[in-house]
Amino acid sequence: MNSANPCCDPITCKPRRGEHCVSGPCCRNCKFLNPGTICKRTMLDGLNDYCTGVTSDCPRNPWKSEEED
């Protein structure tokens, strides 16, 4: 159990009522970050990974090749 996390229900380990997420690169203060927020920067401009606003995960930019990851 993670009772120290204010976003986490200590019994279920899921987000508390009214909260979106517990942790992740696109989660801050128990809420999903806004769509378009950079969650992983790359050396190449325009190929950063961005939050979607609906998940706490940081999805891979579909325009990046495997070598650029």
Curated annotation (Swiss-Prot):
Keyword Ligase included in the entry's annotation: no
Gene3D superfamilies: Disintegrin domain
Signal peptide positions on this chain: none
Location of the motif Cell attachment site: 43-45
Oligomer and partners: Heterodimer with VLO5A; disulfide-linked.
Protein family (similarity comment): Belongs to the disintegrin family. Dimeric disintegrin subfamily.
Protein name, entry field: Disintegrin VLO5B
